[in-house]
Amino acid sequence: MKVLVTGSSGFIGQALVRRLRAEHCDVVGLDKVPAETTDIVCDILDANGLTKAVAGTAPDAVVHLAARIDLDEKTDLSGYTANIEGVANLVEAVRRTPSVRRAIWTSSQLVCRIGYVPANDTDYKADTLYGQSKVRTEEIVRSADGAGREWCLARPTTVWGPGMSAHYQRFLHMIERGHYFHVGHGPLWKSYSYIENIAFQYWRLLSVPTDQIHRRTFYLADYTPIDLIAWCDAFQSYFGSRPIPHLPAGVARTLALCGDAVNAIGLKRFPFNSFRLNNVLTQYQFDLAPTAAVCGPLPCDMQQGVAATVAWLRNLSAR
């Protein structure tokens, strides 16, 4: 199977290219940023260049990952053109390329605000411009019936593991240095996704029979939610750091308000505020049974993921 992966220089993209090559697929990576996993340097906003790239590759399948994924835009959707016009461009490019049999279109869990459980696939409750842009991604794909090919939508949750962004690296270094604290003592359940597991899930979505995926929407995450406290404690153990202390929720809220005040006077890098506290305390779990039924058992458990991530971070630090 020949697969075109857009966004092949990104976190998930690089892992997916490696997985597909390990499964003996013929993989072509496309991204606007050069990388070892990228064969074609092309911006998906360049409609003509994209159409030529897809037609020239003549893939059997397309996995669309290319997107702007930050939450920085606060004014309007114009900053997220890659998630709107870029998707429309790729839909048209796929439509014009007869070799393509299947396409997987990547959306996001943030088409709904964290903590909201949608009643159906088109029950949207985005509370960020990024999330709204991913709603448009889904609407474009649905309205075009996936460019007339076999298709499904994927909604990744929070993805972690080797290759993760500097933001998450800083978080883990806080644990390593003994600067992190738990809020309260109860479990905080999160549907997180380990990077090798989500790459495996994408491969399975490419491989299974049509009737198992066509016109469906899949949340992509580990099937068993992670308790944030247990997850952080696992990192602490592998780092060999001091045990993570537990701070009462009331004390944490007071500290967060102090952080808000510090941020308000211009010190944006203060490490704790109400936004981050809410991120910690908000639990979210998704029904992964449909995904598990299609994709099957995952290759890695949490402990394996933590061990691999710590080894990767130490290798980075040694360079």
Where are these regions (language model features)?
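N-terminal Rossmann NAD(P)H-binding glycine-rich loop of SDR-like oxidoreductase domains
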Residues: 3-23
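NAD(P)H-binding glycine-rich loop region in Rossmannoid oxidoreductase-like domains
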Residues: 44-85, 96, 115-118
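Conserved Rossmann-fold NAD(P)-dependent oxidoreductase catalytic core, especially the SDR/UDP-sugar
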Residues: 89-129
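Active-site Tyr-X1-5-Lys
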Residues: 128-152
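Substrate-positioning beta->alpha
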Residues: 164-170, 184-207, 215-216
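Conserved C-terminal active-site "lid" loop/helix of NAD(P)H-dependent oxidoreductases
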Residues: 195, 255-298
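Mid/C-terminal beta-alpha module of Rossmann-like enzyme folds, strongest
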Residues: 208-271, 306-310, 317
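Amphipathic terminal alpha-helices
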Residues: 288-293, 300-319
